[in-house]
Amino acid sequence: MTNRKIKSNLIQSNLRAREFWDCSERNLCAVWLALLSMGVSKSKINAIDDEFHAVTVPQCRQDAEDGVLETRFACWLTSVGLTFADIDNTAKRFYKRLATAFVTREAYNIATDVLRTDLTAILYQISGSLGYGQKRIKKILDFIAAYQGDEKSEAAEKLNIHYPDPDTLPDVTDLYTRKRKAVKQHERDNMAAAALIAR
């Protein structure tokens, strides 16, 4: 899907978002609009949203009522035909792939900690369950950055989309980048120390 098509979808959907979804929680709006920009139909998103308002899956009803966001997404995904096993396996496959992308175990742990504690983890699980690859997931993260209203965001400039209240959503892309830089610096320090010891 081209940036122009994504922009068109986002502008049209954002103008009428409250007619389709209860956006009292802005994070939810971001996810619904992100899914819409990925080409997921309104009917499928509505099915997920309906599950948010009336969770019927016994295994996760209490967690959903307690506000555990990740569990609530699992409930919603079951409403469109995915099983708990599907969701769990998707997450495991993603984290296994992620492990091969980092040299050290510490780097892997930092990355997974970041992804498990913010909206990125949810988007990765949804995207993976829908069969999307890393490049398309990156577009979703770019969209979230644009949705934050960050005028310095490359995605915001490309899509020419600026929203108010940028502090509502975590800047997951910057957080991830900072963690990666910190890990690389730590690895360089370790290599330098090892070289000194070897002398």
Residue ranges of predicted features:
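Intrinsic disorder/low-complexity detector
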Residues: 2-31, 66-125, 154-198
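Surface-exposed, Lys/Arg-rich phosphate-binding patches that contact polyanionic backbones
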Residues: 130
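Amphipathic alpha-helical segments that form the core helices of the histone-fold
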Residues: 48-57, 140-148
